[in-house]
Amino acid sequence: MLLLAAAGLVAFVLLLYMVSPLISPKPLALPGAHVVVTGGSSGIGKCIAIECYKQGAFITLVARNEDKLLQAKKDIEKHSINDKQVVLCISVDVSQDYNQVENVIKQAQEKLGPVDMLVNCAGTSMSGKFEELEVSSFEKLMSINYLGSVYPSRAVITTMKERRVGRIVFVSSQAGQLGLFGFTAYSSSKFAIRGLAEALQMEVKPYNVYVTVAYPPDTDTPGLAEENKTKPLETRLISETTAICKPEQVAKQIVKDAIQGNFNSSIGSDGYMLSSLTCGMAPVTSITEGLQQVVTMGLFRTIALFYLGSFDNIVRRCMVQKAKPEVVDKTA
């Protein structure tokens, strides 16, 4: 009886693997496709542009700094696979004026054709204790990280729906899945992206447009180097419990998931566990993905409790360490 049940389970899993591709999105062909990357002048955004260019795409880079854009353009063009490929640079702040963003997207489409994939990678980070952060910091991060993704997406969505093809990628963060000490402003802006993405996916799925949310861990980029200058001790120690990833590795995974139309894009085993743990009511791309989430949830939640306990211990140790000089002063 037990053997029969095991055989039935194996047969069921095999059936899921066979049926899953039939309900999954058709992969997006990158050769000749027009890919727009915001925040594409450095870091993960630039590496995503390179990865798409290596697969034959036409690239529009969007960022604020013209000098960095031109340097990124030169770096990307080294990876061309044919002489027809083009890298277009547009200098604009995607978080300030929707009409301006819409106009530059129209200009890009006039030159390189309709946008097949939009990668929202423009973003910034700021850390500090909740009561020590300026209120303007919360406004700034919501403007850049959230509205800086809303505006470009709004500018391309109508054409994608009309053509019934497209990919929209939102680059969030593991801090957009798990709230951490020092990231009250940053995490909230990254959590907002997921809510936007889930609602948008439900709207555009009937039009064969698919949304991907990427949750990269700490990545070796200029942005991380700048963030580390002011990062609280507690935040730094918690961050050091996981390895720093290379931007090329992160970019390759994001592009792969976007092509496949996967809603979640995670990096490494920790990223996979975190995405499974926080899946909630998020869309799934395949039956197999949903089954994996159901099967692993209990185990991953158990592991997560140990992580949370470790993080709380780090915060307590730092508090005790900071309190010691005060105790010495009172007894002196």
Curated annotation (Swiss-Prot):
Signal peptide: 1-25
GO MF term set: 3-dehydrosphinganine reductase activity; NADPH binding
Lumenal face of the membrane: 292-293
Matching CDD domains: KDSR-like_SDR_c
Ranges annotated as spanning the membrane: 271-291, 294-314
Catalytic activity: sphinganine + NADP(+) = 3-oxosphinganine + NADPH + H(+)
Residue interval(s) of motif GXSXG: 39-43
Localization terms from the record: Endoplasmic reticulum membrane
Residues at which NADPH binds: 39, 41-43, 64, 68, 93
A GO biological-process term: sphingolipid biosynthetic process
EC number: 1.1.1.102
Enzyme class: oxidoreductase
A single cellular component GO annotation: endoplasmic reticulum
Membrane topology: Multi-pass membrane protein
Gene3D superfamilies, alphabetized: NAD(P)-binding Rossmann-like Domain
UniProt family annotation: Belongs to the short-chain dehydrogenases/reductases (SDR) family.
Protein name per the record: 3-ketodihydrosphingosine reductase
Organism from which the protein derives: Mus musculus (Mouse)
